[in-house]
Every structure is written in C-alpha cells, then in structure tokens.
Amino acid sequence: MLPGSLLSRLAFVLSLAAISAACGPAVSAKPNIIVVVSDDQGWADLGCHGMRSDVRTPNLDALAADGVRFERGHASAPVCVPSRAGLLTGRYPTRFGIETNADGPLPASEQTIGDRMRAAGYVTGLVGKWHVATSPANTAQKKSIPPDEILWGDNATVADPHLPGRRGFDEYFCGANRNYAASFDLAGRTLPGAPVLLNDSRFRVDVQTEAALAFIGRHAGTRPFFLYVGYFAPHVPLAPAADYPARFAHVADPKRRAGLALIAAIDDGVGRIRQALRERGLGQDTLIFFTSDNGAPLRPGMENGSLNTPLVGEKGQLTEGGTRVPFVAAWPAGLPAGRVYPHPVISLDILPTALAAAGVDARPEWKLDGVNLLPFLTGEQSEAPHRELFWRFGPQAAVMSGRWKLLHHPPDHWQLFDLGSPEGETRDLTAQHPGEVSRLKARLHAWAAEQSPAGLPAAPIRNPSNR
C-alpha cells in the first residue's frame, strides 16, 4: 500500500494530467512562474469583482477567467513593507520582527522566494518595487538614497547591501520611480559592474513593464524562470502617462480618475506580459499570480483614488479593507479556468504554491506559514487551506477563522464580526457569541506568543508608519 503522502502526490499529478488533456499542452516539469504585485490597489478595483462600473481591467479580468479568482484573498499585512516581507518569505512577517513600514531590512536569516526558486533550478528576476531593504528611517541610509526614492519608499541604492541580487535574485531592475538599481537594461543587455544606478524619468509603470519584458526576452526558451514584478501603482504620486486619464474623462473626481488610470496602466502591463509569453509559446505553461500588497488608503491627504468598496476600512487597518485584496492565479496547463475560490487564502501561500508547481515540497524546518494551494484549486482537497489567518500591526491584532473575525485593540478591547452576514464588520457580536470570542482569543494569544516581539500590544503605538 502506498504511503499517504505518495498517494497525495500521485493524485495531484493525475489531476494535472486531466486538466492538461482538456487544456492543450502537457504540463512541463518546471513551468515559468510570474508574481505581479500592485501597490495600494483596493479590493473594489478589479473589474471582474463587479463592485464598480468605472473600473476597466480587461487583461486582469481575462487572467481571472483563465484561472482562479480568490473571493477572500488577503495580504499578510495592511502596509507595504511587512506585506512584501511576508509574500517574499511565505512566513508571517511578525515572526522576524517586520511589522510596520519603519522596519527593515529583511533579516539575513530569512530565505526569500528568490532563494527558494533559484535552488529549484530557476533563473530568478525582480522588477520594480522591492521595499524590504534598509529602512530609510536610518539617517545615514537616507543620505545614500536619491530624494525621490526616500519620499516614495523604494530604497533603491547601489550602496545598499540588501538589494535583491543578494537576496536570491539573479537579475533585477529594482526601483519604484525614476531611479533603478539594475543588473540589465531595458534592451535586455547585461550591465557590467552591476548593480548600476539607472535613471529613467518616463512613466514608471511602463518602465517596469518594459523591464519585465526584457527579462522574459533574456530567458524565454532557455531555462525555467521566476519573475517578481512589483508595480509602484496605484500608490501615489498620482502621475499616470498622459493618455491614460482620457480613458476616464467621465469620472468627475480627479483623484479617482488618476487612480483608475494607474490601474489601467498595470492592466495594460499584464496584457503585454501575457502577449509576450504567448508569442514565445509560453502562455499555456506559465503560472501567473496577481495581487496587491494591501488595501487602498482612503484618509484625506493619503488617498490614491483606489477604493475598497464594500469593505470596511483601509490601508493601515486590520479590517477587511486593509488586507483583503485582488488575488488571482492562472496556469492554463495546470489549473482549472473560470473558478471563483471561496475560502480565505493569504499572500504567504504564493511561495509554497510556486515551489509545488516547480516540483519542490516545502520542508518542515523552513517553518512556512503559507500552504501549497494547488491541491485545493484542482479539487484534490475540498476543505479550507487554513484553519485560521492572523495579523498584527502596531496597536491592532486580528484572527480570522472561517466566517468569524476577532479584532483586538489595547488594552483589552475586542470586536467579533461575522463576515458571512450582510453586516460584516459593521456589527460587533462579542456579546452574542462569547464562546467564539473565547476560542479565538486563545488562538490569537497562542499565535502572538510566537511572534517577535511576543504578545499582543499592551498600549496604542503612535504612528505605526502606514505610508
């Protein structure tokens, strides 16, 4: 009799074979893998969510139609730095001391998705926003970063020892806006003496798309590649290319118009990336993830024109509007098309899922918090991937378990919400369900005891840096 783990692996292979027979080419041993991350894009701003009639994302909608759209996809934190640290490691960022945007760099003890995919035989690349290097809160570091990069939080400087080239990425075009620390140029040529600081003042989303296309062109058809694309949009500054706002001339609010224009530019970029893959015969056997690092900011002076409708809250908060984000996975040769997945997932799941697609099992000693989603998406496993999901950010902490969500604010304030009810996070049910409150309190305390620092916040923290 075969061991359970072997049976599970055999069943997964057979399920891929069945999907492949229906979809076309057979699944290769190692598909190409691309992870696309937008910046501050709210849950409402994906056309296929059906929340807003002013959103136009035909390429992202097509990606969802060709794969799986996650109805309850979450970021690992409600702001940029910890969210990206979680995605890149597959571990809760609070486990290794990254909780706010003021924290960093990513500890050397943590292995990134670049490290893992390189070990799996992939050539690895990163384009765009990195934001897990040395914190610009450090005065000496500030002096070595171009002023626009300090303002917009990218930390791209050739003097930084925490660039992606030292964190598992063979090649990179790293930067958010104008200044890029790069190992190759937009023509696809290797830059001697890398990292080289390049300046390109053109529209940032287009530059980042061109860098992604250059990386694909360098490696298509040679060996499997892994590419992380960190678009710096629709995060402020609201400066889309001149032709994009005209698409939304009917939108009266100028910030909303600019935000929609930036999202449309990302959508165009994803379309160009997919077209490049198809032209090279790679469209069927490339696994693409798309998500946002957190929800949209809504407060006056911080808003970027994106929206979280109908969710409660915004960037920097642990209500749904802060962490529930667009989340799509498509792999025509390996996943069913047109599926809407109902169970909660989190960006921590991207790393182990990518590894599984590459034929690599996560090891227990890695202590990943994310899980391989493939058997859940192919139907091999029907239960929810996670019993609970957890967050801690500044003065807030939260645990989600199925339809229930418990929020904590210091010193001892608790709110229980039924996410399956029409009221969602607008009605506190702590008095009505004391048993659920007790159960989830215990789970949250146990999880918090494993974080660094351990425990739940005992007092409000001033300015947890949610910019």
Map each language-model feature to its residues:
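Bacterial N-terminal signal peptides that target proteins for export
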Residues: 1-12
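Formylglycine-dependent sulfatase
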Residues: 2, 18, 23-414, 421-467
